[in-house]
């Protein structure tokens, strides 16, 4: 495939995803799915850690989840950094401060680092890659953004974790390059699928461009299919609940599990504005309907899982 054909295919996939996203009724569910999916992909692509989604959901509740390893506890930090990335810089925020915040968020689990030295290294890292980042922010064409991602990836900035930082910034940069402001599309999963080929392509600017466009197309297509799946899963979960067991808070509770498939009783009560007793009544109905399953914890704050919400 030629570079022109690859770029056209990427634009087409992004346009289809953008159009579907505009009509997707629950953008917060889509955003939550993307953040979880991209976190798992970044953990695999940059950290070499094949993390289960259930473990990630537990870590999002408790970042010291007892059944997790030290390396897995990086996942909530990656998750927060991705959310910071797709939100973009605030209107009055210096983009370089925004980039530093993303990097700092991703390193939050490193509790033993020298904070002062780390801050100096972050500033030095940003200055080292200042030119390609400024180019990508001021002239966000697909070609310029692709080269920016490549230079961050192969550079020695960010304590040698340029690959991670490139993947964290990619969703926002892709969004601007392909002029799809509502789209959430990353690169990590597509690039991790054939790591050897990716490592070969990233060292050469021309080879990388074609590889980058193909990864964008694959990622946009996967996100499109995932949103379709999420819509079906939501309808299927609602259908499991008989009308006589349905309440005005059943729907919001199901949506809560679609945003994070593992929830605690206190999370549910707080999110739907209910008392602990009222939340337990809804939880019992969802358990009887087969929507959720109890996990661990005390009766007062037990965890519950909706396995179907992980289907996408």
Describe the role of every protein-language-model region:
Residues 1-312:
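FIC/Doc superfamily catalytic core
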């Amino acid at each position: 495939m030629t570079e022109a054909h690859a770029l056209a295919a990427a634009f087409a996939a992004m346009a289809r995803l953008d159009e579907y996203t505009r009509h997707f009724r629950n953008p917060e569910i889509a955003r939550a799915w993307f953040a979880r999916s991209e976190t798992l992909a970044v953990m695999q692509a940059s950290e070499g850690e094949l993390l289960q989604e259930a473990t990630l959901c537990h870590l999002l509740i408790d970042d010291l989840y007892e059944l997790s390893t030290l390396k897995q506890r990086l996942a909530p930090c990656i998750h927060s950094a991705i959310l910071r990335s797709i939100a973009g810089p605030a209107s009055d925020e210096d983009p370089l401060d925004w980039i530093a915040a993303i990097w700092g968020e991703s390193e939050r689990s490193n509790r033993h680092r020298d904070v002062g030295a780390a801050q100096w290294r972050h500033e030095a890292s940003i200055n080292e890659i200042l030119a390609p980042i400024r180019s990508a922010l001021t002239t966000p064409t697909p070609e310029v953004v692709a080269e920016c991602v490549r230079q961050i990836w192969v550079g020695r900035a960010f304590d040698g974790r340029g690959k991670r930082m490139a993947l964290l910034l990619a969703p926002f940069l892709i969004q601007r390059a392909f002029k799809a402001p509502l789209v959430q599309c990353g690169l990590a999963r597509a690039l991790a699928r054939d790591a050897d080929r990716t490592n070969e392509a990233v060292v050469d600017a021309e080879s990388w461009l074609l590889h980058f466009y193909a990864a964008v197309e694959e990622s946009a297509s996967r996100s499109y299919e995932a949103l379709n799946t999420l819509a079906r899963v939501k309808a299927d979960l609602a259908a499991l609940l008989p009308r006589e067991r349905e309440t005005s808070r059943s729907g919001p509770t199901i949506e809560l599990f679609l945003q994070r498939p593992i929830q605690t009783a206190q999370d549910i009560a707080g999110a739907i504005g209910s008392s602990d007793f009222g939340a337990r009544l809804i939880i019992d109905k969802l358990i009887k309907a087969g929507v959720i399953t109890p996990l661990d914890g005390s009766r007062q704050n037990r965890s519950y899982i909706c396995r179907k919400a992980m289907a996408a």
